[in-house]
């Protein structure tokens, strides 16, 4: 491609509304342009990158024998009403009516559509397992779209769906897709982790997220330094501590804590550390009006874990202070598990404390030297907390460390959630109708582009991994308009590299060298070749890698092979 014939529009200034590096650089390099809130046009430069992502994904999906199809973006409401998600999906579901007042949504995902297709197309166990995928535009009506295409309302996604009769078959396909995702991100040159994850609104029995590691990532990931264990903050757990094996010899004592309502205030007043206290949170129960969740004072409640407890109402709902005072006759800051007449669920870390400070269920009063069993009873012990850096890994191997990531892929073992709701069944080997079970495998195509930039950039611009770069090589002829030798050599190099299947940009614009070099760094082309009269006099071409500040001179007759070897490494 010749830059003079290409729509190459870059910006020096960073847009004011661009918060993170990928958003800033995608706008400055001319990859995207904003149309509206959370809506972006992919310009020619950005589309080249997007297509490279799609091609890698498509190649690896095809290797798993998944079959590509394309489903409608607009979906009838009846399908979503069958599964109950029309009511439960929430405000992110963009709904509409046609001229006949029939209701539809613009699909944020396609579980209902694919299940509807397969319940009509599949009749026998002999047709299973099957796996279908598409690369399709989705829409989620984000309340606050931000970070450019990282959290846009309209986005492109690869979603795949597999159908099975046995859990063993599902697990086999799940493993194949998991490995395909690893190959995809390896080929893209991205540093990532596959982590255990909560199934969330999609549902299912097991899932893994694929997280591209980046300091700007919104997700917290915990991983062991001595094993393969890794999970996101919602799912991560630590080695369960033993229950307190020593009894408290001190007598439980009631003390005044005037106007001390928070853990920090109580701990400071009593001259103790916050990890010597416990806190009691009151939430709505599934069968009881109120349930108490008890954690060590320095721990944070993991709301996803708490919601999974059978006694806790979903979604998690905290009881307001006025109702607590009316029902329990105790202000919120003084509640504790001693003689508390509602179900009590205690976190394992809190249960491991031989004694603790807790609210006394009287205003401005706390107990010191309280102990489990002797003074405080509980209904269940459960993992309720967010893990912390330095916690022991749950597999007993190593300690947990924390990093940030950007979720770019998510795979699920759905089970029969959708198939059962939509009566998707086939005749099994015994001649009986059996409900199918499903797998679901999502990968954010547009998000991968932004995540790659978050991981690969510097103060000058993007540093594309070779597999994703819009162009692999940039040839810059200096003063090519005035020097026939420079122009001729640049053209010769351009044609030779193209003949070897290399994506080449010939930047033949009539601009100053500084502008051409700055644009190359901003766009992030991995390999730069500069053709100048001075270098030609020495029989050389100047080479510079985007990852290095150093330049080197390469003999003219060796340049093509030099580039080919670099690209094929």
From Swiss-Prot:
It is found in: Cytoplasm. Transmembrane segments: none annotated. It comes from the Bacteria. One of its GO terms (molecular function) is aminoacyl-tRNA deacylase activity. GO terms for biological process: prolyl-tRNA aminoacylation. Keywords: Aminoacyl-tRNA synthetase, ATP-binding, Cytoplasm, Ligase, Nucleotide-binding, Protein biosynthesis. Coiled coil: none annotated. Its EC number is 6.1.1.15. It catalyses: tRNA(Pro) + L-proline + ATP = L-prolyl-tRNA(Pro) + AMP + diphosphate. GO terms for cellular component: cytosol. Belongs to the class-II aminoacyl-tRNA synthetase family. ProS type 1 subfamily. Consists of three domains: the N-terminal catalytic domain, the editing domain and the C-terminal anticodon-binding domain. Catalyzes the attachment of proline to tRNA(Pro) in a two-step reaction: proline is first activated by ATP to form Pro-AMP and then transferred to the acceptor end of tRNA(Pro). As ProRS can inadvertently accommodate and process non-cognate amino acids such as alanine and cysteine, to avoid such errors it has two additional distinct editing activities against alanine. One activity is designated as 'pretransfer' editing and involves the tRNA(Pro)-independent hydrolysis of activated Ala-AMP. Homodimer. This is Proline--tRNA ligase. It comes from Legionella pneumophila (strain Lens). The lineage of its organism: Bacteria, Pseudomonadati, Pseudomonadota, Gammaproteobacteria, Legionellales.
